[in-house]
Each structure stands twice: as C-alpha cells, then as structure tokens.
C-alpha cells in the first residue's frame, strides 16, 4: 500500500461533526450580515447620488457648463475667422508693399530719364546758341566782305554745315 502523508492529523468523525455544527453557521450568518450591510450601503449611496444628481444646483451647474461650452465654441469660431481675416490682410499688405516698391523703382527710373533728357536738352540748347553765334559771326563777315559771290558760296556751305550738325545732334 502507498504511504499516506497528510498535512493534518486524522480526526475521528465524531469530533468533526461537533465543529461543523454551530460554529460554521455563525460564520455563514456573519458573512450574510456583512453582505446585507454592504448591499444596504450601496443602495443608500445610490439613492443619495441620484438625489444629488437631480438637484436644482446640479442641473444649474450642468446648464452653466453647457452654456460655457457653447460660448467657448462660438469664441473659437470667431477667433478662427479673425485669424483668417488677419492672414488675408497681411497677404494684401505684402502685395501692396511689393507694388509700392515696384512703383518707386519705376518712378526713380523715370526721374533719372527725365534728368538725362533735361541735361541733353540743355546741351543741345547750348549747341544751338553756339551755332547761332557762329551764324551771326558769318553774317557779319559777309557784310564786311567785298565780293558777293565768294560770300554767298561760303555762307551756303556754312548754312548747310550748320543744318547738318543740328540735325545730327537732335537725332542723337
């Protein structure tokens, strides 16, 4: 036969019956009372929280929370629209700034061209004055000269040279 090894000593049957009787029922009774008390406590707490959750103050708080949430969403939408408008305004400002810079550069070019043209006009006016003076000098020489043919030939050459020179200056 196999060896019997038990962690406890064998107890006669008549002793086991006495322990399981009243002591065992007490433990079950204590456990049942604890379970009932726990259940009653849970029911009372549930009723208390249900009453508290349905109270006027709680409903007012929930209503205020919903209003705050709605106001927050409204403000967020307004902020988004404002930021979009600001971005558009900045884009337009940048475009306007580029246009202003381009127009300033164009104006500076036109001013420099106008100054160059004025300088060229002054130069040509001086040249015309000089040529008029030479023409006057040639007329005086003509009057003082004794021969009419020589004077008329030379004045014709000088006149044609002056016309050629003035036309060349005006072209360039």
From Swiss-Prot:
The extracellular coiled coil domain forms an extended 170 A long semi-flexible rod-like structure important for virion retention at the cell surface and prevention of virus spreading. Induction: By viral or other interferon-inducing stimulation in most cell types (at protein level). Down-regulated by ebola virus GP protein. IFN-induced antiviral host restriction factor which efficiently blocks the release of diverse mammalian enveloped viruses by directly tethering nascent virions to the membranes of infected cells. Acts as a direct physical tether, holding virions to the cell membrane and linking virions to each other. The tethered virions can be internalized by endocytosis and subsequently degraded or they can remain on the cell surface. In either case, their spread as cell-free virions is restricted. Its main location: Golgi. Residues 74-147 form a coiled coil. It is found in: Golgi apparatus, trans-Golgi network; Cell membrane; Late endosome; Membrane raft. The lineage of its organism: Eukaryota, Metazoa, Chordata, Craniata, Vertebrata. Parallel homodimer; disulfide-linked. May form homotetramers under reducing conditions. Isoform 1 and isoform 2 form homodimers and also heterodimers with each other. Dimerization is essential for its antiviral activity. Interacts (via cytoplasmic domain) with ARHGAP44. Interacts with MMP14 (via C-terminal cytoplasmic tail). Interacts with LILRA4/ILT7. Interacts with RNF115. GO terms for molecular function: metalloendopeptidase inhibitor activity. The keyword Transcription regulation does not apply. The keyword ATP-binding does not apply. This is Bone marrow stromal antigen 2. GO terms for biological process: defense response to virus; innate immune response; negative regulation of cell growth; negative regulation of cell migration; negative regulation of intracellular transport of viral material; negative regulation of plasmacytoid dendritic cell cytokine production; negative regulation of viral genome replication; regulation of actin cytoskeleton organization. Pfam families: BST2. Residues 1-30 are cytoplasmic. A lipid is attached at residue 152 (GPI-anchor amidated serine). It comes from Mus musculus (Mouse). It is a single-pass type II membrane protein; Lipid-anchor; GPI-anchor. InterPro entries: BST2.
């Amino acid at each position: 036969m196999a060896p019997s090894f038990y962690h406890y000593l064998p107890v006669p049957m008549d002793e086991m019956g006495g322990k399981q009787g009243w002591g065992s029922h007490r433990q079950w009774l204590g456990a049942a009372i604890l379970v009932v008390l726990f259940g009653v406590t849970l029911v009372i707490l549930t009723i208390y929280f249900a009453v508290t959750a349905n109270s006027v103050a709680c409903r007012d708080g929930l209503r205020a929370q919903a209003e705050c949430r709605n106001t927050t969403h409204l403000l967020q939408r307004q902020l988004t629209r404002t930021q979009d408008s600001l971005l558009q305004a900045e884009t337009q400002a940048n475009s306007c700034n580029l246009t202003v810079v381009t127009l300033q550069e164009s104006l500076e070019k036109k001013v420099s061209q106008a100054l160059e043209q004025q300088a060229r006009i002054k130069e040509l006016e001086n040249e015309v004055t000089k040529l008029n003076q030479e023409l006057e000098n040639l007329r005086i020489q003509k009057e003082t000269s004794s021969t009419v043919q020589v004077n008329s030939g030379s004045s014709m050459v000088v006149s044609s040279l002056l016309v050629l020179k003035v036309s060349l200056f005006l072209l360039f």
